[in-house]
């Protein structure tokens, strides 16, 4: 009985570590995706805003 308790504790600890790593990987992946979206979309938004201002400033179109 004394030998089984440390094994179950180690198994539980390993399970917690694995679950924590999986959650951490998913969390960091979502953060990286959000940062990439912000970095990629902000220049596109700036370009569309500039294009809109140019279109408004030019009545010849």
Curated annotation (Swiss-Prot):
Transmembrane regions listed in the UniProt entry: 12-32
Top-rank taxon: Viruses
Keyword Cytoplasm: no
Stretches of the chain found on the membrane's Cytoplasmic side: 1-11
Topology of the protein relative to the lipid bilayer: Single-pass type II membrane protein
GO cellular component entries: host cell membrane; membrane
Keyword field: Early protein, Host membrane, Membrane, Signal-anchor, Transmembrane, Transmembrane helix
Residue ranges, Extracellular side: 33-61
Major subcellular location class: host cell
Extra facts: The variola A45R protein corresponds to the N-terminal region of the vaccinia A40 protein.
Family according to the record: Belongs to the poxviridae A40 protein family.
Protein name, per record: Protein A40 homolog
Source organism (scientific name): Variola virus (isolate Human/India/Ind3/1967)
Gene designation per UniProt: A45R
């Amino acid at each position: 009985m004394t030998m089984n308790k440390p094994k179950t504790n180690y198994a539980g600890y390993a399970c917690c570590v694995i679950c924590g790593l999986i959650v951490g990987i998913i969390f960091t992946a979502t953060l990286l995706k959000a940062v990439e979206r912000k970095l990629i979309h902000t220049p596109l938004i700036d370009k569309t805003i500039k294009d809109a201002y140019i279109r408004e400033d030019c009545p010849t179109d």
